[in-house]
Amino acid sequence: MPSENLAAARVHLQALVNTYRENFAQYQRATYNETQVRVDFVNPLFQLLGWDIMNEAGLPQHLREVTHEATVLVEENGTHRSKKPDYSFKVGTETLFFLETKKPFVNITVDRAPAFQLRRYGWSGNLKVSVLTNFTDLFIYDCTVRPVEGDEIGTALIAHYHYTEYDEKFDEIYSVLSKESALSGEFQRVFGNIRGAMRREPFDAYFLDQIRGWRMQLGKDVVKRNPELDTETLNIFVQRILNRSIFLRICEDKNLENYESLKRITTYQELKHLFAAADQKYDSGLFEMLDEDRLVISDSVIIEIFQSLYYPNNSYEFGVVDPYIIGQIYELFLDESLEIQVDGQVVCVQKPEVVDAQGTVNTPKNITDIIVDEALGALYEGKTPEEVAGYRIADICCGSGNFLLSAFEYVVNYHIEYLCQNSLEEALQSGKLYQLPGTQNLFLSYEQKRTILENLIYGVDIDPLAIEVTKFSLLLKVLEDSSAEELDAYHARTHNRILPNLDENIKLGNSLVDSNYAHYNRAVYQNLQLMNKMRMFDWNREFTEGKFDAIIGNPPYIRVQNMVHYSPE
């Protein structure tokens, strides 16, 4: 910000602080609520830091610098807390930090709950830092430090400013929390490598370690209880148990399932009943048991895993976890698989192709968004929803589905932006769009999102576990921003199960080899094991509607000379 603008901002800040000081006793009353302190003081403070708090630039919703959330209170351990932070501050589509506000009556220098709540949000959101304020005080917290019950207010605290210091330390505050700091890279430089933090365990690394541990726990127990299992069946079964359980746990924090429904499970038989009820509600194939009814898991293993999904054993806030983060975690998770050794022991081994490539490297979301924008931008530009309704998008080596998540998000945002610009009133009246009460946030209806997912998004992968994860990630994504009331209304109106079945969209196969290969190598027909491993894929048979309008993705790049090390066939 030019020095003259910075000086003007300081003058406005001084006036803001003086108003607060002169009426301090009034603002300290219990009747002066959070909404009032946001409007009177918090919004103006962050506007002085350069943020477009009220979207005066008229940016599309997905590109707004600041997103406001409606307050939804839930009960946990006898106390009430909100489900989402009050504000999200973003650059482009990347969230930089959350801001949680409390009314001045709440003394955040004494009460530990607000800081702990904010840190749960920031940690689960996989953010570097987040901010807590009641305007009297402003705290910046390191959100790479995992919140643990009993943490003090000072745990993971980076900076603390009293309102009487805002003027004196404005340059310092501006240098780390301003929009200019975010755009210049100063925010990332300052908070990208915070020194001296204790117990630094970012959400993505911690949750990856947890699900790896759960996989091994389940794998060993399942083989012990079901010794006839082969390795592939074991991996798919364990993956499905994890996917279903994590899906339901995420739905709990999104108010789509009763909270602690998994925590109350005491036997595997009860879990199967829960999955059967979920299958009736959601359909989608995610909860279909197939031959798995015959397999047995020890009750104690189920109980231990489910207990670790809840506070106080862990501080997960799945309501703020981006499906893309889950996809990235699973992408690393898929580097390894369970293997049953000749002596019946279960071990976790890294896939040979991953060893050769020295590990999987995730494609960051901002990169997938850029690639998808380049691929789809020219297709969608200047067209109406009717004109793009049949555009089919595919990732032919989809892995955990992150490119498909970005593609789905692109199409949803295109529809929101088009309707806002061309037929907002009609879209709201017809239900194509809905506005979250108490906010400016507009969302595409669940029915519209489901139609997009079912008709436009397709993927193929040779790894059956990747197929399971891609479906799982896309189903989480289509539920994003949908309430239980909206889903129930959709079910009552259409008589459809809530979730789409993606078996015709996301398919298992080798996208580079079809059955014509057998004409050149007839020996394949004599080797059933080789045929199963090759997973030949006939595009015309699997996707009868024909061509795709856009192919996206970032397939594994492996030198042909190295392929023989892990796939000699």
Question: What annotation goes with each model-predicted range?
Answer:
Residues M1-F24, N77-R81, P85, F89-L96, ...:
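Short, basic/polar, glycine-containing "phosphate-handling" surface segments that engage DNA
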Residues P2, L45, N55-T93:
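Active-site metal-binding core of divalent-cation-utilizing nuclease and nuclease-like domains
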Residues A25, R29-F46:
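Nuclease catalytic cores
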Residues T31, V37, M54-E56, P60-H68, ...:
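SAM-dependent methyltransferase catalytic region
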Residues V39, I140-T144, E260, V469-K471, ...:
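A short acidic (Asp/Glu
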Residues L49-M54, C251-L262, S337-I340:
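Short helix-capping/linker segments at secondary-structure and domain boundaries
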Residues S245, R249-D291, A394-G401:
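Extended, well-ordered alpha-helical scaffold/bundle regions in very large, multi-domain proteins
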